[in-house]
């Protein structure tokens, strides 16, 4: 499977880690799995890690990804970790998410993203 998904930190958040060369269908499967885990755990925090992906994320992929996040309930907090070479897409992804009422912050470091996700802000 090209992704790992599980509730972490005793259900404090759901982590989805993607790896390899992913298709849009595999990305969608990861999002669907995350959605089911969030429903089961009752938490409102999601951490998505794209750092192990082997392909460059396109502008179209970012747009489609942001659109797919609309299925999550309002008020959900989402941290997105991307490879350093994809940092150019961070502001674009955050703006797309904000325009859809989604609280999303983009990071290049797992620990920093996790600290933000678990903080009260």
Question: Which residues fall in each region the model found?
Answer:
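Amphipathic, Lys/Arg-enriched alpha-helical "gate/interface" segment within cytosolic domains
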Residues: 1-121
């Amino acid at each position: 499977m090209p992704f790992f998904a599980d509730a972490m930190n005793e259900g404090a958040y759901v982590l989805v880690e993607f790896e390899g060369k992913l298709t849009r269908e595999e990305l969608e499967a990861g999002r669907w799995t995350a959605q089911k885990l969030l429903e089961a755990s009752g938490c409102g925090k999601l951490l998505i890690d794209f750092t192990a992906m082997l392909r460059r994320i396109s502008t179209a992929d970012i747009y489609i990804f942001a659109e797919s996040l609309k299925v999550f309930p309002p008020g959900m907090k989402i941290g997105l970790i991307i490879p350093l070479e994809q940092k150019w897409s961070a502001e674009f992804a955050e703006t797309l998410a904000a325009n859809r009422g989604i609280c999303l912050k983009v990071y290049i470091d797992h620990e920093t993203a996790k600290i933000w996700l678990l903080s009260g802000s």
